[in-house]
């Protein structure tokens, strides 16, 4: 049957960390998380006012250490990014200085290819134009004897 102390009326939702009803676990202010990466939690509700100074000092030290770590990590990231940028710049400089002759040769080759393409286009246009003119001449030749015959009669 039902347990005598577990009615819905008797059970009140409360904090699982400190046990006080009035707030939920995620709202608990009686516990402080020292390091967000680790599961180190300090119980503030059980400490007395005399010890609070010592704990606040410890908390300050821990927070200072954590800030130092974060700053060091950021500095390392910045240094790595700077080194990468320097390496990229060095690579670009070395490539450009050693391949100046190659780049000029490549430019000449590109220019020559463009010229060849232009010549081919011009030739094909000329050829088409000549064909049209030949057709016109043939038509004129065919039609001109007919005209001459008509004029003769």
Swiss-Prot record:
<feature type="modified residue" description="Phosphoserine">
    <location>
        <position position="96"/>
    </location>
</feature>
<keyword id="KW-0862">Zinc</keyword>
<feature type="compositionally biased region" description="Basic and acidic residues">
    <location>
        <begin position="66"/>
        <end position="84"/>
    </location>
</feature>
<dbReference type="GO" id="GO:0008270">
    <property type="term" value="F:zinc ion binding"/>
</dbReference>
<dbReference type="InterPro" id="IPR001878">
    <property type="entry name" value="Znf_CCHC"/>
</dbReference>
<feature type="modified residue" description="Phosphoserine">
    <location>
        <position position="52"/>
    </location>
</feature>
<keyword id="KW-0597">Phosphoprotein</keyword>
<keyword id="KW-0479">Metal-binding</keyword>
<feature type="modified residue" description="Phosphoserine">
    <location>
        <position position="97"/>
    </location>
</feature>
<feature type="compositionally biased region" description="Basic residues">
    <location>
        <begin position="106"/>
        <end position="141"/>
    </location>
</feature>
<dbReference type="GO" id="GO:0006397">
    <property type="term" value="P:mRNA processing"/>
</dbReference>
<comment type="function">
    <text>Possible splicing regulator involved in the control of cellular survival.</text>
</comment>
<comment type="subunit">
    <text>Interacts with SREK1/SFRS12.</text>
</comment>
<dbReference type="GO" id="GO:0003676">
    <property type="term" value="F:nucleic acid binding"/>
</dbReference>
<keyword id="KW-0508">mRNA splicing</keyword>
<dbReference type="GO" id="GO:0008380">
    <property type="term" value="P:RNA splicing"/>
</dbReference>
<protein>
    <recommendedName>
        <fullName>Protein SREK1IP1</fullName>
    </recommendedName>
</protein>
<keyword id="KW-0863">Zinc-finger</keyword>
<feature type="region of interest" description="Disordered">
    <location>
        <begin position="44"/>
        <end position="153"/>
    </location>
</feature>
<feature type="compositionally biased region" description="Basic residues">
    <location>
        <begin position="85"/>
        <end position="94"/>
    </location>
</feature>
<feature type="zinc finger region" description="CCHC-type">
    <location>
        <begin position="13"/>
        <end position="30"/>
    </location>
</feature>
<dbReference type="Pfam" id="PF13917">
    <property type="entry name" value="zf-CCHC_3"/>
</dbReference>
<keyword id="KW-0507">mRNA processing</keyword>
């Amino acid at each position: 049957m039902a347990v005598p102390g577990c009615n819905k009326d008797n059970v009140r939702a409360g904090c699982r960390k400190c046990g006080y009803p009035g707030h939920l676990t995620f709202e608990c202010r009686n516990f402080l998380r020292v390091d967000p990466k680790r599961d180190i939690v300090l119980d503030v509700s059980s400490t007395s006012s005399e010890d609070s100074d010592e704990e606040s000092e410890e908390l300050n030290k821990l927070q200072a250490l954590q800030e130092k770590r974060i700053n060091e990590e950021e500095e390392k990231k910045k240094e790595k990014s700077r080194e990468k940028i320097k390496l990229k710049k060095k690579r670009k400089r070395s490539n450009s200085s050693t391949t100046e002759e190659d780049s000029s040769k490549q430019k000449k080759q590109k220019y020559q290819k463009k010229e060849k393409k232009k010549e081919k286009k011009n030739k094909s246009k000329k050829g088409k134009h000549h064909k049209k003119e030949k057709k016109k001449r043939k038509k004129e030749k065919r039609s001109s004897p007919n005209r001459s015959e008509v004029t003769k009669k």
